[in-house]
Amino acid sequence: RKINVGLIYRQQFFEVEESEPIRLVFKDQLAEKSYTRDILYVKGKLVGEIVHLFIVHLPSKIDKEINQLKRQQIFKVIRKRVNDLLTENFSEKIIIMGDFNDTPTNSDLIEELNTRAKQEEVIGKELFNPMVGLQSYKRGSLIFKKQWMLFDQQLFSKSFLQHQSNLEYVK
């Protein structure tokens, strides 16, 4: 589709230390290569503290079977990277954000990325999804067929829920 994800930031608050596109290549039944948008990984300092960002724009729900498999694989790749970061340093600050092209209650999102709707349920490597509480029939990030959908989401690692630094999730 030739559409990439990006990160817009203010230099006075955020300093990029490293970044890399994470490219996934898929093969169909005829062994033809197929691509999705890259995941953008960025490590940087946000007001002096190291954060890890994964910016996504996942495949749409059109061509459900094909794209669902791609989405599941993307979730697995991100989850592995998150697990690696947290295994190396359990207090890493990690945010996964972007257009998930699905709701916060999607089972693949919950299972593959190990997300939780409540802060108190994040006790280890789980990710907190505050968007679950925001989704309703009266609001969202887009309207499809006259119905609100909440596809744009942010997921946070446990360290954002603790009061041990300058950066924390505040409701």
Task: Locate predicted features.
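Structured beta-strand-rich core segments of catalytic domains in phosphoester-bond hydrolases
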Residues: 1-50
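Active-site metal-binding loops of divalent metal-dependent hydrolases
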Residues: 58, 99-100
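Metal-dependent phosphoester-hydrolase catalytic domains
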Residues: 86-92, 102-171
